[in-house]
Structure formats: structure tokens, C-alpha cells
Amino acid sequence: GSCALPFMLGPTKLGFTDAYFEAASGLTTTGATVITNLDQLPRSLLFYRQSLCFLGGMGIVILAIAILPMLRIGGSQLFRAETTGPVKDTKLTPRIAETARALWLVYVGLNAACALSFWLGGMTLLDAIGHAFSAVATGGFSTHDASIGYYDSPLLEALCILFMFLGGINFALHFVAWKRATGGPYFRDSELKAYFAIALAVSAVVAFDVSAHGVFPGF
């Protein structure tokens, strides 16, 4: 509920229900929004809104696990509830808190790489960071009403696709591949193979439909 306060007290002046919806949408990386005229909002509020996607992307539970041991509270069950896939029950590091921190390191690293790519691709620094938070978390939020289309840049759209795809992969798998300094874990993972096949198939169907209906002339 407290995450909704900036939307209630800030320039958007949302009611409790709408503000709660907006905050929940960000933290769960749903991407639905009730806010319009994003281009007119203060940059501070836009950054806050994008940061909700960043926090929700890896999972606040994982963040909590990293600090729970300091309070002498176990986090193993929370970690297993928050992670998925074949490496779910694999110990990536000796201690669960170290594993949570390692996954956050991978997550932050991807966000940094994405933000740098967006910035070099022509975005302002705020937009680069904000869209990185959203892309890696697959959260769907943007700092513009036109979303990534605001820039009308095939390069930025391609970068966004790339980092959204990477963000959709099991972060434990990213960590294992990084730790072993090899891409082997990616090629052996059945979950990733299914993910890639589904993404490719759905993309092909959508591209065909868009082309058939002339949504983008010249496509």
C-alpha cells in the first residue's frame, strides 16, 4: 500500500484503487497502467514508477532473502518459492543468502548493460535507465505514452527485444553460465529450449498477422 502513495500524493492525484493498481502492476511486472500523459510528468515520479519494475523483476522476496540472515531468519523456502526451472533445487553457492546476492549481481549487471546500450543508442540517461529497468524485468512500463516507439529507432527496438529475452531466462542459469565461463548450460537447459521455441513461434505468428493486415506499411 505504501508504494501507492507517490501516485496519490504526486501530480497524478490518483485515487487509492488506481494508485494501488499502478504500484501492484509495477511490482508484479504486469505492465498495465491507468496513467496517461506520461511525457508531462516529473522525471522523479517517472523514475520511481520504473523502479517498481526493477524491484519486482528479480523479486522483493529474493532481496529479502539476502538480508534475512542478518536477522537470523531462514530464507530457503522463500527462495524456492521465488525461483523456477531445472536449477531450482541446485545449490549455486554454499549459502542461500550468497545465492540471492549472486542472482541480484547478475540482475544488476544485465540492467547496467541494457541501460548503457540504450544510452549509446540515443536515449537520454533517464530514459535509458528507466527502460532498462522495464526491459530486463519484462515489466512493460515506459517514460513515454508511445513507449519504445517514441524514439522510432529499429536499433533501440532490437536492443529492447534482446534484453527482454535475456530477462525472461532463468537468472540462476545466467549465473551458472557466468560462473563456469561457458555457454554450455544454455544449450543443455530444456526450459530455455522451450522458451526460445515458443518465443520464436509466437513472434512469427504475430509478424505474419501484422504484415497481412498492413499495420506497418512496407513491413
Regions found by a protein language model. Give the residues of each.
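Membrane-proximal intracellular helices of multi-pass ion channels
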Residues: 1-219
